[in-house]
Amino acid sequence: MALPETLHDFLLVFLGSGLILGSLGVVLLTNPIFSAFSLGLVLVCISLFYILSNSHFVAASQLLIYVGAINILIIFAVMFMNSSEYYQDFNLWTVGDGITLIVCTSIFVSLVTTIPDTSWYGIIWTTRPNQIIEQDLISTSQQIGIHLSTDFFLPFELISIILLVALIGTIVVARQ
């Protein structure tokens, strides 16, 4: 989008704060329904970030796939859960929570120490005039399809297998 710089900066700060508040809502809210709605807010904010970056196809895909399908599936699964069983076995602190805290803290500390030491100016950013002219003949969705079937084939297939395992796990949990 060709927005004025002040409006673009304001939207970045607004979407960033919405993203942070939504993520905190996903993690900190005890009601799973509210947590799922907060996840929807996070996914919509990410989609709006893509729109600000002029990636309209990715933004539409984000809205359709994640917000329109996966988040709704999560909300339906949470609504089918028996809430009395969910709150009955609630422990304040478990061993898994301690391990998760240690892992997340170590990742956070490593990121905090690595990011300031990175030479961001050494990264080559591609700009529009420097790109190959033949790429203009192929539409954006065709470029995405070409990259998914060549360069990103293995990660794309791994993500599809992970989603398949998650759906099978959801079906198994729903049957019990």
UniProtKB/Swiss-Prot annotation:
Main location: plastid
Enzyme kind, highest EC tier: translocase
Name used for this protein in its record: NAD(P)H-quinone oxidoreductase subunit 6, chloroplastic
Organism field: Cicer arietinum (Chickpea)
Pfam families in the cross-refs: Oxidored_q3
UniProt-listed Enzyme Commission number(s): 7.1.1.-
Gene name per UniProt: ndhG
GO MF term set: NADH dehydrogenase (ubiquinone) activity; quinone binding
UniProt keyword list: Chloroplast, Membrane, NAD, NADP, Plastid, Plastoquinone, Quinone, Thylakoid, Translocase, Transmembrane, Transmembrane helix, Transport
